[in-house]
Amino acid sequence: IRNTPKKDNRVVFIGNSITEGWDWHYPEYFKKKGYINRGISGQTTPQMLVRFRSDVIDLKPDVVVILAGINDIAENTGPSSIKTITDNIISMSQLAISNNIKVIISSIIPARDFPWRPAIDPRYKILKANSILRSYALKNNLVYLDYFSKMHDGNNGLIKQYGIDSVHPN
């Protein structure tokens, strides 16, 4: 894909297992649309920021969709503050903008708990991070894709029928 010539209206999706899973479940959808999936399971925002140039900018897309932050909150690579999470997502968006790539920032999807980290309650951090990301997007005239408000169960967890577990939507 890195050597693929630029197609009209190309969109890159960058994220974690949630993004990666879209390609598993709907591979033809991505191929038909010319979408490029750059989701890597388990990744945190610092890891995505490191690969942002090669996985997004070098592909010269028209649009990037950023869905990130849940694995930071799950402490996959150690504790992470809300500021660090949102700063990394904002840095990715600034890199895209400086390369004339339109940015769509996705909310962090609701989660009540993490099957792999049962001691962590992510709900407060998700709400706070989403508030910061929404404000940043609005202030900078970016699209904010609000999955959270449509997918939470009233207790800030993922609606059961929307997920294969408490984190990953189906």
Spell out what each predicted region is:
Residues 1-65:
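Serine-esterase "nucleophile elbow" of acetyl-processing enzymes
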Residues 109-170:
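Catalytic His-Asp segment of secreted/periplasmic serine-dependent ester chemistry enzymes
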Residues 82-106, 134-142:
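Charged, glycine-enriched surface loops/patches
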Residues 42-50, 79-89:
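Glycine-rich anion/phosphate-binding loops
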Residues 67-73, 92-126, 151:
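Active-site segments of SGNH/GDSL-like serine hydrolases
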Residues 51-55, 85-92, 122-125, 129-133:
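A general structural detector for well-ordered alpha-helical segments in enzyme core domains, enriched
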Residues 17-21, 41-45, 70-75, 109-113, ...:
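Solvent-exposed loop/turn segments at secondary-structure junctions
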